[in-house]
Amino acid sequence: MGIPMRKPLLVLLVFLALASCCYAAYRPSETLCGGELVDTLQFVCGDRGFYFSRPASRVNRRSRGIVEECCFRSCDLALLETYCATPAKSERDVSTPPTVLPDNFPRYPVGKFFRYDTWKQSAQRLRRGLPALLRARRGRTLAKELEAVREAKRHRPLTARPTRDPAAHGGASPEASGHRK
């Protein structure tokens, strides 16, 4: 009686599967260059942003940039994380309240045509929760009125005509009436 051929073949296949998994886990990390590097950094760092060279406080190797590290050498997740900017505050972090300026804080215009009052009214309207439909309807009405005024100015006659016809009322020019006497 011999050993069935199926059992050693099954053992060999299982061994090859495990070996390939272990090799994939311990093989050197891949290299990233150009757009792939930027896309990967954006994915890893998210809202925090990233640097192409580490800030001075984080330098633990010779000052190489991320391009030299990831494009010419192997690049892994831990290395990518070192190039992320300072972490953004989490939503649960309430240690420092947001800065709120008092209403009497002096405000200075930013530009030549800056109208703080108009902006403030719009912001107050938004805070009150005025529906966008009403704001849009009011804006459309104002736009139609403005267009009507512009149209009226555009079609104004160049010379003004008298509203009454002088010949119809028997009134001729003063010179003509003076000759009748």
Curated annotation (Swiss-Prot):
<keyword id="KW-0165">Cleavage on pair of basic residues</keyword>
<dbReference type="InterPro" id="IPR022352">
    <property type="entry name" value="Insulin_family"/>
</dbReference>
<feature type="propeptide" description="E peptide">
    <location>
        <begin position="92"/>
        <end position="181"/>
    </location>
</feature>
<dbReference type="InterPro" id="IPR013576">
    <property type="entry name" value="IGF2_C"/>
</dbReference>
<feature type="site" description="Important for interaction with integrin">
    <location>
        <position position="48"/>
    </location>
</feature>
<feature type="region of interest" description="A">
    <location>
        <begin position="65"/>
        <end position="85"/>
    </location>
</feature>
<feature type="glycosylation site" description="O-linked (GalNAc...) threonine">
    <location>
        <position position="163"/>
    </location>
</feature>
<dbReference type="InterPro" id="IPR022353">
    <property type="entry name" value="Insulin_CS"/>
</dbReference>
<dbReference type="GO" id="GO:0001701">
    <property type="term" value="P:in utero embryonic development"/>
</dbReference>
<protein>
    <recommendedName>
        <fullName>Insulin-like growth factor 2</fullName>
    </recommendedName>
</protein>
<dbReference type="Pfam" id="PF00049">
    <property type="entry name" value="Insulin"/>
</dbReference>
<feature type="region of interest" description="C">
    <location>
        <begin position="53"/>
        <end position="64"/>
    </location>
</feature>
<dbReference type="GO" id="GO:0005179">
    <property type="term" value="F:hormone activity"/>
</dbReference>
<comment type="function">
    <text>Preptin undergoes glucose-mediated co-secretion with insulin, and acts as a physiological amplifier of glucose-mediated insulin secretion. Exhibits osteogenic properties by increasing osteoblast mitogenic activity through phosphoactivation of MAPK1 and MAPK3.</text>
</comment>
<dbReference type="InterPro" id="IPR022334">
    <property type="entry name" value="IGF2"/>
</dbReference>
<dbReference type="GO" id="GO:1905564">
    <property type="term" value="P:positive regulation of vascular endothelial cell proliferation"/>
</dbReference>
<feature type="region of interest" description="D">
    <location>
        <begin position="86"/>
        <end position="91"/>
    </location>
</feature>
<dbReference type="InterPro" id="IPR036438">
    <property type="entry name" value="Insulin-like_sf"/>
</dbReference>
<keyword id="KW-0339">Growth factor</keyword>
<dbReference type="GO" id="GO:0051147">
    <property type="term" value="P:regulation of muscle cell differentiation"/>
</dbReference>
<keyword id="KW-0892">Osteogenesis</keyword>
<dbReference type="GO" id="GO:0043410">
    <property type="term" value="P:positive regulation of MAPK cascade"/>
</dbReference>
<dbReference type="GO" id="GO:0008284">
    <property type="term" value="P:positive regulation of cell population proliferation"/>
</dbReference>
<dbReference type="InterPro" id="IPR016179">
    <property type="entry name" value="Insulin-like"/>
</dbReference>
<feature type="disulfide bond">
    <location>
        <begin position="45"/>
        <end position="84"/>
    </location>
</feature>
<dbReference type="GO" id="GO:0006006">
    <property type="term" value="P:glucose metabolic process"/>
</dbReference>
<comment type="subunit">
    <text>Interacts with MYORG; this interaction is required for IGF2 secretion. Interacts with integrins ITGAV:ITGB3 and ITGA6:ITGB4; integrin-binding is required for IGF2 signaling. Interacts with IGFBP2.</text>
</comment>
<feature type="site" description="Important for interaction with integrin">
    <location>
        <position position="62"/>
    </location>
</feature>
<comment type="function">
    <text>The insulin-like growth factors possess growth-promoting activity. Major fetal growth hormone in mammals. Plays a key role in regulating fetoplacental development. IGF2 is influenced by placental lactogen. Also involved in tissue differentiation. In adults, involved in glucose metabolism in adipose tissue, skeletal muscle and liver. Acts as a ligand for integrin which is required for IGF2 signaling. Positively regulates myogenic transcription factor MYOD1 function by facilitating the recruitment of transcriptional coactivators, thereby controlling muscle terminal differentiation.</text>
</comment>
<feature type="signal peptide">
    <location>
        <begin position="1"/>
        <end position="24"/>
    </location>
</feature>
<dbReference type="GO" id="GO:0001892">
    <property type="term" value="P:embryonic placenta development"/>
</dbReference>
<dbReference type="GO" id="GO:0000122">
    <property type="term" value="P:negative regulation of transcription by RNA polymerase II"/>
</dbReference>
<feature type="region of interest" description="B">
    <location>
        <begin position="25"/>
        <end position="52"/>
    </location>
</feature>
<feature type="disulfide bond">
    <location>
        <begin position="33"/>
        <end position="71"/>
    </location>
</feature>
<keyword id="KW-0372">Hormone</keyword>
<dbReference type="GO" id="GO:0060669">
    <property type="term" value="P:embryonic placenta morphogenesis"/>
</dbReference>
<dbReference type="InterPro" id="IPR022350">
    <property type="entry name" value="Insulin-like_growth_factor"/>
</dbReference>
<dbReference type="GO" id="GO:0008083">
    <property type="term" value="F:growth factor activity"/>
</dbReference>
<keyword id="KW-0732">Signal</keyword>
<keyword id="KW-1015">Disulfide bond</keyword>
<comment type="similarity">
    <text>Belongs to the insulin family.</text>
</comment>
<feature type="site" description="Important for interaction with integrin">
    <location>
        <position position="58"/>
    </location>
</feature>
